[in-house]
Structure formats: C-alpha cells, structure tokens
C-alpha cells in the first residue's frame, strides 16, 4: 500500500480517467492502412500470381486435341515438325471444343539396341516415353524402329484392332504400316527442311519420313481406353487406303 506521503499531494482531478479520444472514420482508415499495408501488398501479389497462372493455364495455353508420339534416334527438323502438325490437324476434329484442331508431336529420342547412341539422350527419352505411356498421352506412334519399340514397351496393337499377347512382340510387323504404305501420309505437303538446332543437313521432309512406320496403341484397361479413344478417328483417317508391307522380308 502506498504511504500517505505519496498520496497526500495527489489532486483528485488526476484520479479521473482520461476521456478516450474518438477517432474519425478517416483517421481509423488511415491507421488501418498503416498497420496492414504490407499484408495487403503481399496477399495482392500472391493473388495476382495465382490468377495469372490460372488464366495462362486454362485460357492462354493451347490444348491439343491429339497427341502423336515420334520415337527415333534423333529429333525431327523443326520445319518438318511444324508442317506435319499442321497437316495432321486437317484429318482430325475439334475434340476439346476450343474452335480449332491442334495436333502436338511429342518427340522421344531413343536408339534401341544401339551401342553408338547418346546415353544421356536415351535416358531422357526413356523417361519421357515411359511417362507418356503410363499416362496414355499419345495414341498414335510414328516410329523409326518399330521392332525395338514393341520389344521394349509392348504397347502396340494389331492393325485389325486385336490386342497382342505378351509373347507376341516379335510379330511387330502386323502392328504397323510403313509411312509409304499410307496414301494419306505420303500425300501431305510437308515441304523441305534446312539445317537448324537439331539437324545439320537439309532435305525433303517426305523423303526423311519414308523410313518411318506408324502404329496405334493398344488399350488393355478401361481407364486407358477412355483416354485413347479420341485417337481412333484420326488413325482411321490417316491410314485410309493403306496396305501394310511391313512384313515383307520377315
């Protein structure tokens, strides 16, 4: 308890509580901004970033109607890829309803059973191709080495639509057409290519693709079948009138 010596000089007026100041609405608003401005900026920037990513992903990004894989020891020239994507789109439909038909070529560099191949490119290609197959991304495959591809992945189906048994990989020639077997493919205007970042030579794109084959994935599960079904009409259009010669010499 405080002593009388300290209490005797206290003015009773000093014991009255001070009247609390009433701030105006403008002053309260200014104080709120002083304390919270940095948080408003932080959340505003974060929100703008999320909105940008959302808009970019769903409205500004072109989503392909079809994914077609190219598996070969080297990348196709950029000019060939661009021309081929445009020509393939002419035989497809607008599956996602965005008003245009887009075909995307997914290139995977793999040299099956080759000791001279680039190990880094083969590893990268194997990883990407495995992801494609596991996610049922590409339904149609343009192949440089269909025998090596089928032996490694076992994903192709027979040309008549039947699914091969697990020990039928050596029967690969009944699962593909040569590029030159398909009148639709050989009739495409693909132009020529010049040296670029992935190709040191120049030449005709159709001549380059003449050594390739084309096949379609088999679907052993309902989930993969539903993901791959959009590729069926495109496959039928591209192989219309084709007669396979892949088995000649086997």
State where each predicted segment sits.
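Short, well-ordered beta-strand elements
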Residues: 65-74
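Hydrophobic membrane-insertion alpha-helices, especially the h-region
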Residues: 35-57
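Short, polar/charged alpha-helical segment
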Residues: 78-100
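Extracytoplasmic "Venus flytrap"/periplasmic binding protein-like
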Residues: 118-184
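N-terminal intrinsically disordered, acidic low-complexity segments at the extreme N-terminus
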Residues: 1-20
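Extracytoplasmic/periplasmic C-terminal soluble domains
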Residues: 163-250
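Cytosolic juxtamembrane amphipathic/interface segments immediately preceding
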Residues: 22-32
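Acidic, glycine-anchored loop motifs typical of Ca2+
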Residues: 94-119
């Amino acid at each position: 308890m405080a002593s009388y010596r300290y209490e005797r000089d206290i003015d009773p007026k000093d014991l009255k509580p001070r009247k609390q100041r009433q701030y105006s609405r403008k002053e309260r608003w200014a104080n709120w901004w002083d304390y919270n401005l940095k948080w408003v900026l932080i959340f505003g920037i974060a929100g703008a970033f999320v909105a940008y990513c959302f808009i970019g992903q769903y409205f500004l990004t072109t989503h392909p109607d079809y994914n077609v894989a190219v598996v070969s020891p080297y990348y196709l020239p950029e000019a060939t890829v661009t021309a081929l994507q445009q020509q393939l789109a002419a035989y497809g439909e607008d599956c996602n309803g965005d008003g245009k038909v887009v075909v995307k070529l997914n290139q995977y560099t793999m040299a099956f059973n080759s000791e001279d191949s680039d190990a880094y490119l083969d590893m990268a290609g194997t990883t990407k191709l495995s992801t494609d197959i596991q996610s049922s991304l590409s339904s149609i495959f343009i192949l440089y080495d269909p025998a090596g591809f089928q032996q490694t992945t076992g994903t192709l189906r027979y040309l008549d639509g039947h699914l091969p048994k697990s020990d039928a990989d050596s029967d690969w020639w009944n699962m593909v057409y040569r590029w030159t077997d398909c009148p639709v493919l050989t009739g495409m205007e693909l132009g020529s290519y010049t040296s670029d970042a992935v190709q040191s030579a120049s030449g005709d794109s159709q001549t380059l693709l003449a050594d390739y084959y084309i096949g379609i994935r088999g679907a052993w599960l309902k989930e993969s079948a539903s993901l791959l079904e959009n590729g069926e009409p495109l496959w039928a259009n591209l192989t219309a009138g084709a007669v396979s010669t892949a088995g000649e010499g086997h």
